Amino acid sequence: MRNRVRVLKKRANSITWRVRVQMMTRLDPTRPNTTLYDSAPRRPTRLDSTRLDPSQPSSHSLRGSPSHFVVAFSRGRGRIGSLDCAANPTDQSETGCDGHNKMKDIRSQFEKNGFVVLEDFFQPEEIDELKSCGEEFTTNLPPENERKVFNTLELQQNKDKYFLDSGNKISVFFEAEALEDNGKLKVHPRVSLNKIGHALHWLHPTFKKYTFDERVKEAAFQLDYQEPAICQSMYIYKNPGIGSEVIMHQDATYLYTEPVKLVGFWIALEDATQENGCLWIAPGSHKSGVHRRYVRNKDPESKELLVYDRAAPCYQLSNFRPVPVSKGTCILIHGQVVHFSYPNKSDKSRHAYTFHVIETQHTSYSKENWLQPPPGGFLKLYRN
């Protein structure tokens, strides 16, 4: 705690960015037959007082108009210093500006919806620097004999081992549609990669600089993280035409702590739209627990080193809302909120940099997780 206070005192000026508040369909505890997901052949799980409302039309349109707030953080007090409405004053009753009653700070919105949109989190020139570094990886690809395509059960063990070994490295992951079986590219190198992971935040100087930036520390502080640590990082390409779908999931499935205290920082390096594969999030779904785990396989005879502990839930698509954002925006994603993205079939890429932060104080990180800490532990956010 003393270290955190000392770090905060070093900061000179308050940070200002824009928090976007979208009036979406939220939890409806009055509907007794509402379910978040059905998982055959098991009986649908009921969510009691934290149900989602599936009665909304399936067009996925947003209710109401997005509104914006300028948030100036008071570092010394560790809470919001001021909250000024930047939306149309006539819309205050709908957007929640009236008296600051509905949306007072980042934490209240995060706890209510399971995510927060912070616009202008990084400046355009900073985003361009990150994107330039991401594009450099496409000019220095591994040799063909190291570009592996894992498409059979026999090779599943090799796939899992490569994934496990990537935790403390900068590893290259290709798009499935980018390679022939022999490793030759079917597409231009610039659009061949799915992602780079999982230790960019420490092993690459530029990504390290922005991961441990004061704005990141401030956001974690606002979410009441006492001793946060960065456990993984990824550069996501979502290339035009072949950018893969990301299935509906919770981040806590893969990075489980007890109790769960996990937040993802998802930073848009380009405009993310419905056309090029923006995130879709189910507001309030973080209140429904962890639906399944992705763990190390205890069966020594199995070809699979990593397995899910239960079948995939069947989520209702009507519960999800698109979250299109502009370049430079950061979305804070609760570890239990369900989210996904469609394949990118457009002619525009959708690059993003993302990393995950866990609480290390009064929590335990599961030894069953695919990603395990290095000998010295995960890197502490406030101390670097």
Q: For each predicted feature, which ranges?
A:
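Polybasic, lysine-rich low-complexity intrinsically disordered segments
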Residues: N3, K9-K10
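Methionine residue identity
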Residues: M1, M23-M24
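Non-heme Fe(II)-dependent double-stranded beta-helix
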Residues: C85, Q92-K112, E119-V246, L379
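Non-heme Fe(II)/2-oxoglutarate
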Residues: N140, E144, G167-K169, K287-D299, ...
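Residue-identity detector for glycine
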Residues: R2, G64, G76-G81, G96-G99
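Short, conserved beta-strand element in jelly-roll/cupin
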Residues: Y256-T273, P324, H356-E359
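Double-stranded beta-helix
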Residues: A272-V337
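Short polybasic linear motifs
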Residues: S14-W17, R26-S59, P66-V70, P89
